[in-house]
């Protein structure tokens, strides 16, 4: 299995970080969904960008709760680990949820690009005028990749779950998918989940590179659009900080943050693959888990800071909490 031993302190640190990430994920994504739904109810309408943003927040909110359920399931009901259908279901749900989380974020980036960028190209103008249909088409095409990703699960040679308790060891040799290696401790039990064929991570990384490439192209095209707009403003001797320039900059800031977090996430996946084949280090795989959860959670807070409505709502909530805290202090003994 593995030669490296993870200490109890490493597991404790990992658990604390994971717990903090999950709590932040629930609060952040729940906040985005709640604000947009309340605004939708109040105005009786919702913009296309808010529709994508709300769907993304709900997807990630469910993802966080799915991770919590998985952890509780593995720690409180360890006997379920020996059932291949349970682990298969977990792997499939993870793939589906991760797929929509990444592709909805990509759709949001493409939507901002088509709305903000300015090109005289006829194809770009055609797509710009039909931005809603473009986003819908991206979702539909991504479903093909999702189906292919799920079908690729049949390529597994062996998936094993070892449960160690004293001198007792159980092994499940069914071909069952799971995103990566996991380790959970429950009392004296240690569960090591590993895919000996090393097929999942390369295939999943390949499918994740597709939305990353789409987002990167949209980001680079937005930079080019800003450069052209800036040159045009210089020729016309107009102020450099007009509304279009600010919209470009704000979209670029959000896009850059998403790509940076995405790149770090993919980097950890690559490191995880290398650690499986070469290093054999479990600590790297623990950080792989942390980065996998931290990527969508961190991006959600980037979206809050980059959206005027969400940022103002968050500031209002913080102001109310600060006022309530002061009131409680004055009422105290």
Curated annotation (Swiss-Prot):
It is a multi-pass membrane protein. SUPFAM superfamilies: Family A G protein-coupled receptor-like (SSF81321). Pfam families: TAS2R. It comes from the Eukaryota. Several bitter taste receptors with distinct ligand specificities are expressed in a single taste receptor cell. Belongs to the G-protein coupled receptor T2R family. This is Taste receptor type 2 member 110. It comes from Mus musculus. The gene is Tas2r110.
């Amino acid at each position: 299995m593995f030669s490296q031993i993870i200490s109890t302190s490493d597991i404790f640190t990992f658990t604390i970080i994971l717990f903090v990430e999950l709590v932040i994920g629930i609060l952040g994504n729940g906040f985005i969904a709640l604000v947009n739904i309340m605004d939708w109810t109040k105005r009786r309408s919702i913009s296309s960008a808010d529709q994508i943003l709300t769907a993304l927040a709900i997807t990630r909110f469910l993802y966080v709760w799915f991770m919590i359920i998985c952890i509780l399931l593995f720690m409180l009901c360890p006997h379920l680990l020996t059932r291949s259908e349970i682990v298969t279901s977990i792997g499939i749900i993870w793939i589906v949820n991760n797929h929509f989380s990444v592709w909805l974020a990509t759709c949001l980036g493409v939507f901002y690009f088509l709305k903000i960028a300015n090109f005289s190209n006829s194809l770009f103008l055609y797509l710009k005028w039909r931005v809603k249909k473009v986003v819908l088409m991206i979702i539909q095409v991504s479903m093909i990749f999702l189906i292919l990703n799920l079908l690729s699960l049949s390529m597994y040679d062996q998936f094993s779950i070892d449960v160690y308790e004293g001198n007792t060891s159980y092994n499940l040799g069914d071909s069952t998918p799971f995103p990566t290696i996991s380790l959970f401790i429950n009392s004296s039990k240690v569960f090591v989940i590993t895919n000996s064929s090393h097929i999942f991570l390369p295939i999943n990384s390949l499918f994740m590179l597709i939305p990353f490439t789409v987002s990167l192209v949209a980001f680079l095209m937005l930079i080019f659009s800003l450069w052209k707009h800036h040159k045009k403003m210089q020729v016309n001797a107009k102020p450099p900080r007009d509304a279009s320039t600010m919209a470009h900059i704000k979209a670029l800031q959000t896009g850059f943050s998403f790509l940076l977090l995405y790149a770090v996430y993919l980097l950890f996946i690559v490191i995880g693959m290398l650690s499986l084949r070469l290093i054999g280090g479990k600590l790297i795989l623990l950080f792989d888990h942390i980065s996998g959860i931290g990527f969508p959670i961190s991006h959600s807070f980037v979206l809050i800071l980059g959206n005027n409505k969400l940022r103002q709502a968050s500031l209002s909530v913080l102001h109310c909490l600060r006022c309530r805290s002061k009131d409680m202090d004055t009422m105290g003994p």
